[in-house]
């Protein structure tokens, strides 16, 4: 073979090498390209708030989600894993830092796909020196009239929502704070600021108590507090203002209650009584009033002490008409008399006397013990089936002792005149005149009534005076 053959072989070898490179480039272009290196996390910092340490970092945006691994190292110790394969940018390292007064470091690396970045390391962190502490708790109470009690609560160590204790007098908490109380007093538009220091003798493991004397509690007070660690020179955050309103004397309020409450009860009782009295009187005004004529009858019946005797009705079959007596049959509307006879004059006089007795309402002449008047009257009602209205039989004497004439009307007079005379009954009636009594004989309080005499012939031969309906009332009924 000559030199030409050797040169041809060399050219062929070069072509094969170039084609192999081109094929490998095309194959890798179809797959996802991996970055030549994974970026390192930046700004790795350890922070602590109320002794709760946390390490945080920053990382650039990637097409794939990166995951991180965190390691912690304390002074004179080794690196230990705290958080592995997390996607968050913060990790709590409370469990790895057992002593807050010892220096600690943290480092973080990222992993994207199958490649990992280098570790990014934080600066030295001393929790008791560089950590932050929140404000203490505060509460105000009125202890006396011119004294306020301020309660300051130590900051708490809270990890994952659970309290791990308070920051007071323990090496694991590294802080014992000296508290300063700030008082803002608004007095008549002028704002006064004062400071009060809380002594350690006034504190325990939970709180500190401070008593503040004030001149008066009739103005507004606002109080806040903060603390400082004299060894580490760490100051807490200042608390929010807690204000107490002006003081009001409760004794004055109690006196007002004691005065107003009885007055209110008394007023309510008066109103209820007035309402009840008004309702009672309104019912009385609606009650039915009796006529004067019925009131006289009720009064006479009430004042009567003698027991009532039975009524004996004289019928036309057993008449007791005397020679000197006249039967007056009253029609429903009027009584018919002869105008020219002397008996009419006496009858008119008798009716006047009867009206006078009725108008006066006197019952003295009707009692059994009163002496007989010059004019004696005895009456009875004649009830008959063939008569349309009641009749009254009236006997009267003239003033000179002789019997007067007779006045009659209708057929009832002729029936009575045909009856035989009974002289013995006449004499008995003249010597023993029966007393007159009123008795209610009416029906219906809303109808007019007329005076009616009824003879009572039981025992003492008494006469009873009653009432009957007038013709006008009978027509209405």
UniProtKB/Swiss-Prot annotation:
Detail the disulphide connectivity of this chain as listed in its UniProt entry.
83-91, 128-174, 203-208, 222-243
Keyword Ubl conjugation appears in the UniProt entry: yes
Q: Which GO terms describe its biological process?
A: astrocyte activation; defense response to virus; microglial cell activation; negative regulation of amyloid-beta clearance; positive regulation of amyloid-beta formation; positive regulation of gene expression; positive regulation of tumor necrosis factor production; type III interferon-mediated signaling pathway
Question: Where are residues bearing Phosphoserine located in the sequence?
Answer: 362, 370, 379, 402
Which stretches are transmembrane?
A: 255-275
Residue list for modification Phosphotyrosine = 445
Where do the coiled-coil regions begin and end?
none
Chief localization = membrane
Instruction: Describe what happens without this gene.
Output: Deletion mutants show shortened lifespan and enhanced intestinal tumorigenesis. These tumors exhibit increased inflammation. Loss of STAT1 signaling pathway activation is also observed. After viral infection such as junin virus, mice develop disseminated infection and severe disease.
User: What keywords were assigned to this record?
Assistant: Cell membrane, Disulfide bond, Glycoprotein, Immunoglobulin domain, Membrane, Phosphoprotein, Receptor, Signal, Transmembrane, Transmembrane helix, Ubl conjugation
Reading the lineage from the top rank, the first entry is: Eukaryota
GO MF annotations for this entry?
Answer: cytokine binding; type II interferon receptor activity
| Designated name of the protein | Interferon gamma receptor 1
